[in-house]
């Protein structure tokens, strides 16, 4: 997506997401962030919709590579209940030493990274042994929905900052040496059917 496209997407993102955020999606974010412990990294923090949900963690680092999103995120830093550091970095190339974090969080991010396999390898690298990767991601459905997701994947990505409809993040975790501890497949409403289902899970660094 072009720089102009990123600016426009950042400008409308919160408004576009508001109906879902005020419903089940907001509750799912609460659940995901409730798993965060110790030193925490959130990849693809976007406009900061999770920020106010963090409590009782030792350290919080928010990674966001898109400048217009970071500017929106900066406007929410006053909502934080814990010390926060914001870093300009993509999920595929994190500027942290190995074994730096107890928890890595990803909510609606891995659908749009350029290389989800590389991103998950980085997640595993920066997690301490026994650390947790907590995620809420949408992606590949089944049956007729999967057919339509494949048909619409390219045009959808073109207008939604590279968001893909066909990824199954949970299926990529074992290759990254992340062992699934909990996984639920969900259909929160109101959410467009084309982006369903969502997968909420916890995986442990092997």
Language model region names:
Residues 89-104:
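A short acidic, Gly/Pro-enriched loop at the edge of an enzyme's catalytic core
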Residues 130-138:
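Conserved beta-strand signature within the Rossmann-like core of class I S-adenosyl-L-methionine
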Residues 41-93:
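Class I SAM-dependent methyltransferase SAM/SAH-binding core
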Residues 1-37, 49-50, 67-72, 149-152, ...:
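Conserved class I S-adenosyl-L-methionine
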Residues 117-129:
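A short glycine-rich, Lys/Arg-flanked "PGG" loop and its adjoining helix->strand segment in the class I
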Residues 181-206:
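Core SAM-dependent methyltransferase catalytic element
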């Amino acid at each position: 997506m072009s720089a102009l496209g990123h600016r426009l997407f950042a400008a409308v993102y919160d408004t576009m997401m508001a109906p879902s955020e005020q419903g089940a999606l907001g509750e799912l974010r609460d659940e995901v962030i409730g798993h965060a412990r110790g030193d925490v990294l959130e990849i693809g923090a976007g406009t900061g919709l999770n920020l106010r949900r963090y409590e009782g963690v030792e350290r919080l680092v928010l990674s966001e590579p898109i400048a217009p999103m970071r500017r929106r995120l900066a406007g929410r830093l006053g909502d934080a209940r814990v010390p926060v550091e914001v870093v300009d970095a993509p999920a595929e190339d994190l500027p942290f030493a190995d074994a730096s974090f107890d928890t890595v969080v990803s909510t609606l991010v891995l659908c749009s990274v350029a290389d989800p396999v590389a991103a998950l390898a980085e997640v595993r690298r920066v997690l301490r042994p026994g650390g947790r990767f907590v995620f809420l991601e949408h992606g590949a459905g089944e049956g007729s929905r999967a057919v339509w997701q494949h048909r619409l994947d390219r045009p959808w990505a073109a207008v939604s900052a590279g968001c893909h409809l066909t990824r199954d993040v949970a299926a990529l975790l074992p290759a990254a040496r992340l062992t699934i501890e909990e996984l639920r497949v969900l259909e929160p409403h109101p959410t467009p059917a084309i982006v369903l289902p969502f997968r909420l899970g916890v995986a442990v660094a092997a």
